[in-house]
Structures are given as C-alpha cells and as structure tokens.
Amino acid sequence: MSGPALTHIDSAGEASMVDVGDKTETVRVAVAEGFVRMKPETLALIREGNAKKGDVIATARLAGIMAAKQTSSLIPLCHPLMLTKVSVEIAPDDALPGLRVEAMAKLTGRTGVEMEALTAVSVACLTIYDMAKAADRDMEIGGVRLVSKSGGRSGDYRREGDMR
C-alpha cells in the first residue's frame, strides 16, 4: 500500500517522536479556525460584557495564546517550540449565531506549527464555553480545522474553498 506514511509510527509500529534535527530551519506559519454556536441572547450577553465570569473574548484570546505555548505538554509527540508569534482573533457572527475563532502560530524552525494553531483554537473555544455556560449549556463547539500552513519540506497547504 503506497501513499502518505504516518510520521509518528516507527518501523516496529510504535509511536515515536519524529527526529527533526536534520531538517532545515524555515519560517513556518499555520492558521486554524473553529466556532462556538450559542443562543442569540448569549451572544448579546458576551457582546455587552455582561457575562458573569467577565470579559469572555479577552479571556478566551489569552487562553488560546497560552495553550499554543503549552502544546507539547498536552500532545505527547509534539516538539517543544520557540514560537515567535501567536495571535487569536475572536469575532461575533450573528448568522451562526456565536463566536468565530481564528488562530495563527509562527516560528522559524524545523517543524510545523499546525498543532499549536489548532490547540489555540480548541482552548479558546473551550474557554468561551466555560465562561458562558451559566447562561447557555446548549452551546456547540465545532469546525475546528487547519485553514493553511506554510514552510517546511511538505510545502504549503490551503484548505480548498477558503479564500484567505
């Protein structure tokens, strides 16, 4: 069977950390996204800054940034990385209704930052849920996915259909 191989499985079929020591350092950037769907009145509460636990958007943004920096502690085979930039943008979306989350992670290094961007989005979404659950336990977290990545041996990737 040919095709892409799983990089974290060794010849004996065991999980192992990839050796990136021989890779060339390049600028790596990854963007991920997700959303938290909620009742319109919950979104209004967050917009007005009246959530019981405080500023939901600011707290979720910080949680996402902190999570990206802790990715290797959370996901067993991820390398600890010296991230040079992490940003988390959270925007209300009345059509959802809810909040859309986008994270970007960047570094100059030997391995990609896709997991860091995905972790940032995931934890930002979880933080939104935690901070607003008193008002709306029916919230739904979804759409967590890689949007794009650049740098490295495998080249650039952009999710089809996205115009970013």
Curated annotation (Swiss-Prot):
Gene3D superfamilies in alphabetical order: Molybdopterin cofactor biosynthesis C (MoaC) domain
| UniProt entry tagged with the keyword Acetylation | no
- EC number of the protein: 4.6.1.17
Gene Ontology biological process terms in this record? Mo-molybdopterin cofactor biosynthetic process
UniProt KW keywords: Lyase, Molybdenum cofactor biosynthesis
UniProt-annotated binding residues for substrate? L77, C78, H79, M115, E116
Q: Which GO terms describe its molecular function?
A: cyclic pyranopterin monophosphate synthase activity
Disulphide-bridged cysteine pairs: none
Q: Does the keyword Repeat apply?
A: no
Top-level enzyme category = lyase
Purpose of the protein: Catalyzes the conversion of (8S)-3',8-cyclo-7,8-dihydroguanosine 5'-triphosphate to cyclic pyranopterin monophosphate (cPMP).
The text of the family note is: Belongs to the MoaC family.
- Quaternary structure note: Homohexamer; trimer of dimers.
Name this protein carries in UniProt: Cyclic pyranopterin monophosphate synthase
Q: Which organism is it from?
A: Sinorhizobium medicae (strain WSM419) (Ensifer medicae)
Tell me what gene encodes this: moaC
